Amino acid sequence: MSGLNKKFTVIGAVALIIMDILVLTGTVKASETSTFSSFMWNMVPAGLLLGTTVLCVNFDVSAKKVAGVISVIVFGFMAAFRALAFGVFIYDRITLENPVAMTYSDYTKTAELVGYMLLMVAAIFFIMFLLKGAFRKTTTIISGISFAIIVGAWVVNLYNLINDAIFYDAAFSEILSAFISDGLVWSLVMVIAYLSTFASNLGLLKGAEKKD
């Protein structure tokens, strides 16, 4: 693993530790979910993505195969879970007895579900790349799209929060409280963790491209 990849991996690991502390202490949790659910559905896949990268780069073939099989199963389940959550959310919106217009929050929640679902799919392709040397371009493209969606949703949420704060002339403490309660801190740590890990993985993908 190159020096740059190691730096990005460390950044991702630190972000994951911060996320773990926030989740387990109940300081921050994904909206409308318990602390345990937040940990299971968000912390675990991020940790596995990071851990598998380290295993596949630094250990022998047998470790790669074990890590690869476990990760493909887990990330496949995660992608299916995100797809199910997305489907349930849309179904609920369509079948409401008194349908209401979609809000910015609804749109960003939908975007985040799609973004993380694509990210799980990208993770599967990345593991296959590490094991087989294939799917390099596919991994890069899907990962890039997923991050664009996730980061875009975060920016929109932040923009709406600032707009509301200006409109209601909110105090700084109220803005900070809203920033935390709206899940923006959680989302930011998630983005840093995933993005730094992806940057490390992208270095591996580019390294493979030079060897082709």
Where are the model-predicted features located?
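Cytosolic juxtamembrane helix at the C-terminal end of the final transmembrane segment
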Residues: S2-K6, L55-K64, I124-I145, L161, ...
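Alpha-helical transmembrane segments
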Residues: K7-L22, G76, A193
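Transmembrane alpha-helical segments of multi-pass membrane proteins
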Residues: V10-V14, K65-A83, T140-W154
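Membrane-embedded alpha-helical segments in integral membrane proteins
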Residues: L16-S31, T52
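Hydrophobic alpha-helical transmembrane segments and adjacent interfacial helices
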Residues: D20-T27, G76-V88, V151-Y159
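Interfacial non-cytosolic loop connecting adjacent transmembrane helices
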Residues: V28-S38, V88-V114, V156-L188
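Membrane-embedded alpha-helical segments of multi-pass membrane proteins
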Residues: M40-G51, V114-V121, L188
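Membrane-proximal helix-loop-helix units in multi-pass membrane proteins
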Residues: A80-T139
